[in-house]
Design a protein with these regions (language model features):
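Generic, low-specificity signal for short hydrophobic/alpha-helical stretches with a mild N-terminal bias
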Residues: 2-6, 27-30, 40, 60, ...
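ATP-binding glycine-rich phosphate-binding loop
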Residues: 27-50
Length: 153
């Protein structure tokens, strides 16, 4: 059996989806909850839809990209940004074991992957040709607040 890392990209995607759906079992979610890939870059990001109408985002971290400690530090900062009202960040969801970061194994992958489930944050992509000067002004203000927070954190 070919190792995950040696597989072509198009053969890795279904295995990542298997891992994402397996990860849902680590959380208190109803049967029938499913993941659907949204994006693949450094990490794989999935939209998770529960049959009761709740929606989440699941992040499957790329193997070896960030340590568990680095992910925990990022999450602690995101939680504090939200708590202090600096910026709205997605709320991470604790697993059944009480931990935010879950380690999920797949038989075709060398090591378990770090996985984090977040509450869904609604939004919309800008339209093609849309004037983005207003949204970028807001983004600049948010970035400034985050910079100040990071210097004091």
């Amino acid at each position: 059996m070919t190792d995950f890392d040696s597989l072509p990209h198009e053969e890795q995607l279904p295995l990542l989806l298997e891992l994402a759906n397996a990860a849902l079992g680590a959380y208190d979610l109803p049967a029938g909850t499913v993941a659907k890939m949204l994006n693949l870059s450094e990490n794989a990001t999935y939209r998770v839809d529960a049959p009761d109408g709740r929606r989440f985002a699941l992040r499957v971290h790329r193997d070896g990209y960030h340590s568990r400690q680095a992910i925990a530090s990022e999450l602690a900062w995101e939680i504090d940004l939200r708590r202090t009202g600096v910026v709205t960040t997605p709320n991470p969801i604790k697993g059944r074991d009480g931990e935010i970061i879950q380690d999920i194994a797949h038989p075709r992958m060398k090591r378990p992957r770090h996985v984090v489930l977040f509450d869904w944050e609604t939004g919309a992509e800008p339209g093609i040709g849309e004037d983005l000067s207003g949204p970028f002004e807001v983004l600049g203000e948010i970035t400034a607040r985050m910079h100040i927070h990071a210097r004091q954190w």
